[in-house]
Amino acid sequence: MNFRPRLIHLRPKHSSRTRLIISFFLGAFLAVACQSTKTADTDLTTQTLAKINFADWIIVSELESQALLYLEQEPLKLGSIGSAILEKDPLNLIGRLALSKFYSSLGTIETGTDFKESYEESIRIISESGNGSPEKPWVVSSNQVAELFLKDRGISRVGGVYQSNLQQKLGLMILGLEGVNTRPQEYYFDLSHLLNSANAYLSTDKTQDSDNPWPLLRLLSESRDSAAQAAIGAYLVKQKNYKSAINWLTASAQQDNLFAHTLLARIFWSQFSGIEQMLRSDRDESTLTAENRESLRSQLNDLKTKSQSHHRQAISLGSVESMYTLGRLLFEGKFGPGKVIEGQELLEQSGKLGNAESFLFLAHHYRFGSIVRKDISRSTTFFSQAAKLRNPEAIVAFARFLISPAGEGFREEEQFGIVKLLEELVAEKEPEAMVVLGNLSAAGVQTDQSFRRAISWYKKAVKAVSNNIDEASDEIINEVAWILATTSKRSLKRARYALRIIDKRMQDSTLAREKPEFLDTWAAALAANGQFEKAIEIQKQAISK
């Protein structure tokens, strides 16, 4: 008789229809923020993983979970567990460490050392199977082994999700923290080698693809595997089946999965915003009944509270994204008045952990003073902090700020190093950085004034985008043409060049021809070249837009 071990079924409630839908779609494609990855080297897979049948793998997986619970506090319980694991899977990482700790706790140092050495050999083999990137994931035999492997490197797991794509049929992305005051990083693993044996054992449909991840993911989710629950939840979000998605993600979040918490926070806030917009659009009370409006209003506070709660739980797990998002919402008064200070604290915390957007957000608000009192000095500090994180948007924004009248009092500050930061972007072929370097050279800000150097930077920027027809490239050409056509500095003016580049762009780009600011530039370039009648005609088109 073929004995089939069963896992404990703990899953969120969902209808049989929903389950059928999930089974059908997920078998074809599991759309959960996947990234392109390469299949692990088969030789390394053979070295890393013992050839065990899937029924034994299920038992080993359960034992691995038990062993992880006892590793630190109750090593005497590890003897029977470790032995049972290695009996079925002799190369198992967790089994080897379990027996190492068990024998060491008994004072049997030599035996404990032998198992410790075999454990370290397993660690080495996994390390050599990849580098933890999406392109070269580490090959492991289970979610639990991946967690222990990271723990051996001083990385604490705070979340994760299974992923699937054409190159890697079953991957695992784990979010981990390395030390205190750090932001979670992504670590990638490959478990695709499990699928053939898993599907042969689990699937009743023998015509089903042998590398379909769904049967195994369903089994894992029913065994309270948080990453599997998160994967199903994320897939259902993609399908806009939010009710079922929330059930699965909630089950995952209950096990402190940062990925699930952040996704739930976004879902609840999206639902809140949708209802708020619906009520705002129905101010004349022509569509919704009074009863419907009251029902919708009653949901608003609940959705806001849930979103905030999940953001805070994600923050407790180290989420920099939730620090930024919740900080911004509090700062903007979305959760009521008097939350600006708390919001700014979260934003600054997020910025110090590497989120340049947080510093940039504060820089803009202190520059214009819409929510807080205008403070150019603080704005400059936040711009500088954002730029030093080497965020391209922040570097460009800070440079433009220094050139603007608002930044005039801080232009001579040498510690900013903005030119060096822009040159780093230029090395990465960033055309907007070239334009801004031209602006700095033309104005003599943070560098010596040189019109020749400015023109050189402008032409390099135009050359970099001349073959691209897109909005960003349009903007580069429009800015350069405007500067060189309208400048009052004779040594900088290049009217014919400005007309040539804007003429060509207006011929090539349909989008540019529809924008009044581009028509303004075209008219200015025509006027600078003495073509006044055509300039007036184009200017009229701009006004009519």
Say what each PLM segment does.
Residues 35-79, 139-222:
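N-terminal alpha-helical interaction modules that lie
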Residues 104-125, 455-462, 532-544:
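TPR/TPR-like (Sel1-like) alpha-helical repeat modules
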Residues 210, 239-247, 274-280, 297-310, ...:
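Structural signature of tandem alpha-helical TPR/SEL1-like repeats
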